[in-house]
């Protein structure tokens, strides 16, 4: 399973890259706005920081506007992936862009049939939103299971990129399901490192070593 970081914060990306555990980055207009950075410059900076796919989202909602923005964004770096909303106009744009060799990530996917349409159009990735589905009393993990099964049944090459990850249990369940990629906020990634028994074990080892050091005069 590949791990992407869902952020536009360069310091967070640098820390995660240094850990050696992330394979790409996803952004959206909200994350970019939060950083108060020029959009294209920040995307280029992210591409220079992580050597993997970097999703950058269009803001146009019409076919012509999305295709134009996508072509411009794709010119920024070979690793840029264009995030396109799950709408009829968006799927039409995905079909055009995929025929041009431009990688796409269909975002705001909340049903398996939406994911099916995205795959039919040639999307490189589909992003089902786990946490947001859970918020309306549905089962976000079941959604991913259905998408993974459908793609396997019909041999689609589209990658399932699970998004809207709220906590480490989401990551565990998605890994068990066999999802291709999980993109998560930095705070969730940090939590994956920690377990209370690990912390207690380290504390005990250090205490035992200190007692040994005192007893031997080291």
Curated annotation (Swiss-Prot):
Signal peptide segment: none
InterPro entries, per database record: Aldolase_TIM, TAL/FSA, Transaldolase_3B, Transaldolase_3B/F6P_aldolase, Transaldolase_AS, TSA/FSA_arc/bac
Enzyme class: transferase
Stored Pfam families: TAL_FSA
MF annotations from Gene Ontology: aldehyde-lyase activity; transaldolase activity
Pathway: Carbohydrate degradation; pentose phosphate pathway; D-glyceraldehyde 3-phosphate and beta-D-fructose 6-phosphate from D-ribose 5-phosphate and D-xylulose 5-phosphate (non-oxidative stage): step 2/3
Predominant place of localization: cytoplasm
Entry's localization field: Cytoplasm
GO cellular component: cytoplasm
Active-site residues (renumbered): 83
Gene Ontology biological-process entries: carbohydrate metabolic process; pentose-phosphate shunt
Keywords: Cytoplasm, Pentose shunt, Schiff base, Transferase
Catalysed reaction, written as an equation: D-sedoheptulose 7-phosphate + D-glyceraldehyde 3-phosphate = D-erythrose 4-phosphate + beta-D-fructose 6-phosphate
EC number: 2.2.1.2
Protein family membership: Belongs to the transaldolase family. Type 3B subfamily.
Function (record text): Transaldolase is important for the balance of metabolites in the pentose-phosphate pathway.
HAMAP family found in the cross-reference section: Transaldolase_3b
Name used for this protein in its record: Probable transaldolase
Phylogenetic lineage: Bacteria, Thermotogati, Thermotogota, Thermotogae, Kosmotogales
